[in-house]
From Swiss-Prot:
This is Cryptochrome DASH. Gene3D superfamilies: 1.25.40.80, DNA Cyclobutane Dipyrimidine Photolyase, subunit A, domain 3, HUPs. Residues 479-504 are annotated as: Disordered. It comes from Danio rerio (Zebrafish). PANTHER family: CRYPTOCHROME, CRYPTOCHROME DASH. One of its GO terms (biological process) is photoreactive repair.
Length: 520
C-alpha cells in the first residue's frame, strides 16, 4: 500500500465509531485516516423563509458534546478528530492542497438539498484535484439499496404500505464492528480547537430541572442511554404504554437527539432490540421501538422521493391552502401565551429545554395549522431552531403530515386541544409544571381556566388577561369536553360556567381544517 494513500473521512450526521461504514472502509483502504468535522457557518445563519436561527442553543450544546466525545473516543483508538470552522468543501480543498497525499474523500450521503449541494461541491473539488470520492448510505435502519421497490419513485405515499412492504421483503444489514484502532492522520496536522458558544455567536443555555431530556450529546452517552433503557431498567418492555407520557425521562426512549447527529446507529438499536427479545421479552413495546424507527426511515425516503417539495408551501400534494402569517398569533404560539394551557405548556417546555414529547409536537402543530391557520413553515422553522433532536426529514415530514399536505391518508385530521389535554394530562400536572401561574387551579380544570367562575379564578389567584391570557382562539368542538375534566385525585367533574367567553373559531375557508367525524 502506498504511503500516499490518505483518506479524509468527512463526518456530518454520523458522529460515532460503531457501525460507521466510512471508518470501516477507510481502515481497509488507507495508510492514514483524517477524521474531519466542520462547523459550517451556513448552519448558523437564518432559516429560508422566516430567518430564525438554524441552530439553537440546545442543539449546539448537544453537537459540541458530541464532537468532544468523538474526539476523545478517537484518541482512545489511536487517532483524533480534526475540527475546523468553515464550509466543508473549502476545508477539504485546503487539506488536499496542503497535504498532497489525499487519495480519497469519504462521507455518508445526506438527503436534503443543502446537504446534497455540499456533496456536489465536494465532488467538483475532488475531480479538479484528481481525488476519488467514496460515499456510503448509513442513516436509516433499512439501507436505501435494500428497499423492496424498483426505484425510489415507487415508494408508497402511505406509511403503512411502506412498513408492511419492508417488514415482509426487506432486510436490516448487520452492524459493522467498532475498529479497535483507527489509523492515525499524517503527522504535522493540527487537530484544531472545538468552537465555543461565543465563537459561534450563541449563549450557552441554562439547565432546567424540569427537563424531560437532561442528557448530553455523544456516542458514549447514547450507548449508555440504550443500556439504561433496555438492560438496566427494562423500560423498553413498557414503551408502547408509556410513550405518550409528558413528564420524566423514561416515558420514551429519548434516542432521537443521538439519532439525529448519528451518535447511535438505528441498526445497533435494532440489534439490541432483537437481543432483548431473545434474552428478556418480546412484546408490542419492543416492536414499537422498531415501528418508530421505520417512521424515521420513511420520512428520509419521502425526502429522497420528493426532494425540495418537502419545503414547499403546498406540500407533497400540491394542495392550495390559504395559510396566513399573522405574526401576533405566531408570537403567542411560540412564546406559550395562547391562553390554551396544553399548548402553552408544550411551547414553554420547548423554549426552556429544547425538547417536547411526540404527543406535544402533534398537538402544537395541529393548533398552529388547523386552529390558527398559520403557515406550517413558521412552525417547522421554529422547531428547526429550538429542537435538540432536529432532523430535517422528520421535522418537515411531520409538519407536512400535521398540516394535511403530506403523507396522511386521513383527511381533515385535527386535534381537539381540550380532549388531548385531558387524555394525556388528565389531572393537569404537566400544565402546572410548565405554566406555574395556573398552579392554583386543581385537577383537569387547569386545561380550561376561561370556563371557571370568577370566585374559582380568584381562589386560584388567576386573573384572566392579567396573570394568564384568555384564549386567542377557541374551537366549537372543545365545549363538549369541558364537563369531562378531573378535579384532582377523586376525578370529580370540573366546574362549568365562566366569566369570559372566548372568540369562537370561524371557518376561514379551509375546508379540511374541520371535520365533525374526527375526535382526536
Amino acid at each position: 500500500m502506498s504511503a500516499s494513500r490518505t483518506v479524509i473521512c468527512l463526518l456530518r450526521n454520523d458522529l460515532r465509531l460503531h457501525d460507521n461504514e466510512v471508518f470501516h472502509w477507510a481502515q481497509r483502504n488507507a495508510e492514514h485516516i483524517i477524521p474531519l468535522y466542520c462547523f459550517d457557518p451556513r448552519h448558523y445563519q437564518g432559516t429560508y423563509h422566516y430567518n430564525f436561527p438554524k441552530t439553537g442553543p440546545f442543539r449546539l450544546r448537544f453537537l459540541l458534546d458530541s464532537v468532544k466525545d468523538l474526539r476523545a473516543l478517537l484518541k482512545k483508538h489511536g487517532s483524533t478528530l480534526l475540527v475546523r470552522q468553515g464550509k466543508p468543501e473549502d476545508v477539504v480543498c485546503e487539506l488536499i492542497k496542503q497535504l498532497g497525499s489525499v487519495s480519497t474523500v469519504a462521507f455518508h450521503e445526506e438527503v436534503a438539498s443543502e446537504e446534497k449541494s455540499v456533496e456536489e461541491k465536494l465532488k467538483e473539488i475532488c475531480c479538479q484535484n484528481k481525488v476519488r470520492v467514496q460515499t456510503f448510505w448509513g442513516s436509516t435502519l433499512y439501507h436505501r439499496d435494500d428497499l423492496p421497490f424498483s426505484h425510489i419513485g415507487g415508494l408508497p405515499d402511505v406509511y403503512t404500505q411502506f412498513r408492511k412492504a419492508v417488514e415482509a421483503q426487506g432486510r436490516v444489514r448487520p452492524v459493522l464492528s467498532t475498529p479497535e484502532q483507527v489509523k492515525s492522520p499524517p503527522s504535522g496536522l493540527e487537530e484544531g480547537p472545538i468552537p465555543t458558544f461565543d465563537s459561534l455567536g450563541q449563549t450557552e443555555p441554562l439547565d432546567d430541572c424540569r427537563s424531560a431530556f437532561p442528557c448530553r450529546g455523544g456516542e458514549t452517552e447514547a450507548l449508555a442511554r440504550l443500556k439504561h433503557y433496555f438492560w438496566d431498567t427494562n423500560a423498553v418492555a413498557t414503551y408502547k404504554e408509556t410513550r405518550n407520557g409528558m413528564i420524566g425521562v423514561d416515558f420514551s426512549t429519548k434516542f432521537s437527539p443521538w439519532l439525529a447527529l448519528g451518535c447511535i446507529s438505528p441498526r445497533y438499536i435494532y440489534e439490541q432490540i432483537k437481543k432483548y427479545e431473545v434474552e428478556r421479552t418480546a412484546n408490542q413495546s419492543t416492536y414499537w421501538v422498531i415501528f418508530e424507527l421505520l417512521w424515521r426511515d420513511y420520512f428520509k425516503f419521502v425526502a429522497l422521493k420528493y426532494g425540495n417539495r418537502i419545503f414547499y408551501m403546498n406540500g407533497l400534494q400540491d394542495k392550495h391552502v390559504p395559510w396566513n402569517t399573522d405574526m401576533k398569533m405566531f408570537d403567542a404560539w411560540k412564546e406559550g401565551r395562547t391562553g390554551v394551557p396544553f399548548v402553552d405548556a408544550n411551547m414553554r417546555e420547548l423554549a426552556l429545554t429544547g425538547f417536547m414529547s411526540n404527543r406535544g409536537r402533534q398537538n402544537v402543530a395541529s393548533f398552529l395549522t388547523k386552529d390558527l391557520g398559520l403557515d406550517w413553515r413558521l412552525g417547522a422553522e421554529w422547531f428547526e431552531y429550538l429542537l435538540v433532536d432536529h432532523d430535517v426529514c422528520s421535522n418537515y415530514g411531520n409538519w407536512l403530515y400535521s398540516a394535511g399536505i403530506g403523507n396522511d391518508p386521513r383527511e381533515n385530521r385535527k386535534f381537539n386541544m381540550i380532549k388531548q389535554g385531558l387524555d394525556y394530562d388528565n389531572n393537569g400536572d404537566y400544565v402546572r409544571q410548565w405554566v406555574p401561574e395556573l398552579r392554583g387551579i386543581k385537577g383537569g380544570d387547569v386545561h380550561t381556566p376561561w370556563t371557571l367562575s370568577n370566585s374559582a379564578l380568584s381562589h386560584a389567584q388567576v386573573s384572566l388577561n392579567q396573570t394568564y391570557p384568555c384564549p386567542i382562539i377557541t374551537a366549537p368542538e372543545w365545549s363538549r369536553h369541558v364537563n369531562n375534566k378531573s378535579s384532582g385525585p377523586s376525578s370529580s367533574k370540573g366546574r362549568k360556567g365562566s366569566s369570559y367567553t372566548a372568540r369562537q373559531h370561524k371557518d376561514r375557508g379551509i375546508d379540511f381544517y374541520f371535520s365533525k367525524n374526527k375526535h382526536f
